[in-house]
Amino acid sequence: MTTPFDIALIGERINPGFKSTKALFDNQDIAGIQALAVKQAQAGASWLNVNIGARALTDTPWMATVIAAIQDAVSVPLSFDFPSKKVQAACLAAYDPAKAGGALPIVNSITEHRWDLMELYGQYRFKVILMASERVEDVGGVQVAKGNKTADEIYGTARRAALRLMNEHGMPADDIFIDMSVSAIVADTEGLNRATIDAIALIGADPALKGVHMMGGLSNIGQQLPPKAADGSDLKHTLECAFLTLTVPLGFDTVLGTPWRGYEPLPPDHYVLKAYQHFLEQSGTQALRAVRKLYRA
């Protein structure tokens, strides 16, 4: 399946967070994992995200087996979803670029506070997902991670870290994916969705960041909301499309998601798009009321 949006898809399904995938891992069902990889590739995924859960920390051979099996089944490159330098090193060692047409894998992910993963860049070449949701601050001589809540904080972190990757490590802009955290709107009284969209606009307009990608997972945005919008549409899916309708023109170009969801731009008069835009203008209890308008006309 292709998407009318000009975006790339990173297939998210090889992850034990999905019950059906957890069963494949629990049963060591290699053929089932391969079939899931093929399904995502055939649905248009440009990369496949791989996360085998906590077992990655204790069973490197099993992880290498999974990576090899996936690469035997598909030719799309892989994204390794682990915060551990040790695990990432094992993933990169197991990955065979030749089976992906020479394409580099993605390390998912680094932050300013977790920069040690870049020590692997001398031994291996890879693309990287850079989390813009947290920054590092010096507090009494100690480096402390702080969450970003404003557009300027998100943009400042993204710019600082992306330029560091390019200038200190020689990483091409095209190999950098800035992860823009897309939060659930159900309890977003602080304008976090609005801050994310405003930050996307700032990053997309910065000539120093030309060529850098912006991405995110969209599954959180509709969490804990009813299945249907007030107009009868699939609320969660339509919300995801509303977010993309607003952000793809600003430079958001990659989605970590389920490839067969079929993201489509919404027309300007679409009920959910208009209700989401209204929500973005609100804060506090007014934002909560605006969320209810999505499913109560």
Provide a role label for each language-model segment.
Residues 2, 41-42, 71-72, 92-100, ...:
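Acidic (Asp/Glu)-rich catalytic clusters
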Residues 41-76, 88, 182-193:
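Glycine-rich, proline-tolerant flexible connector loops at the mouths of alpha/beta enzymes
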Residues 1-23, 31-35, 43, 253-297:
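Extended, intrinsically disordered, low-complexity segments
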Residues 49-55, 76-84, 102-113, 132, ...:
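Catalytic beta/alpha-barrel core
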Residues 4-35, 59, 108-109, 139-153, ...:
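Active-site mouth loops of central-metabolism enzymes
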Residues 58-102, 196-214:
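Alpha-helix-loop-beta-strand connector modules within alpha/beta enzyme cores
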Residues 4-9, 46-49, 69, 75-79, ...:
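Structural preference for beta-strand elements that scaffold enzyme active sites
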Residues 119-281, 286-290:
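Catalytic alpha/beta core domains of metabolic enzymes, predominantly
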